[in-house]
């Protein structure tokens, strides 16, 4: 018992460290989104007519996008979810610059009734790093 009393801070740090290691796994398990790499994205687009959803802000979008992507910034996603309703039966692949904002988009898409939701792991940066095509947005 004296070990625990003398080393309570060390035990607390060990517990918190362990929780921080496990948390991403728990979060991923209960997320409405599935993660995909660039190969998985190209497969879904080519074989299942997946919708590419760019959730970056307009300035970022204007710098380049994935071919045929639909642009709805994350900040407007809940308000504009009705515009995407006609695509609810299709797989939806959300992406942003690195994959962080598109993960947040998953909850809004699930709330809007989408069932088959994916995140491009690494975002458009991973797409470009893989040498895949990017097109300039038309204004």
Language model features with spans:
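Short cysteine clusters
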Residues: 96
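Conserved G/P- and acidic residue-centered "switch" motifs that form tight phosphate/ATP-binding loops
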Residues: 54, 99
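Rhodanese-like catalytic fold shared by cysteine-dependent sulfurtransferases
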Residues: 1-40, 44-50, 58-91, 102-139
């Amino acid at each position: 018992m004296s070990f625990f009393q003398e080393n309570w801070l060390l035990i607390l740090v060990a517990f918190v460290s362990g929780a921080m290691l496990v948390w991403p796994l728990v979060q991923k398990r209960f997320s409405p989104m599935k993660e995909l790499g660039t190969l998985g994205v190209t497969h879904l687009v080519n074989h299942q007519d997946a919708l590419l959803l760019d959730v970056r802000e307009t300035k970022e979008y204007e710098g380049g996008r994935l071919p045929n992507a639909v642009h709805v910034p994350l900040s407007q996603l809940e308000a504009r979810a009705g515009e995407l309703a006609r695509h609810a039966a299709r797989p939806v692949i959300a992406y942003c610059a690195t994959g962080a904002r598109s993960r947040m988009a998953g909850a809004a898409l699930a709330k809007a009734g989408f069932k088959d939701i994916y995140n491009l792991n690494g975002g458009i940066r991973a797409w470009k790093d893989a040498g895949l095509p990017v097109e300039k947005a038309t204004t």
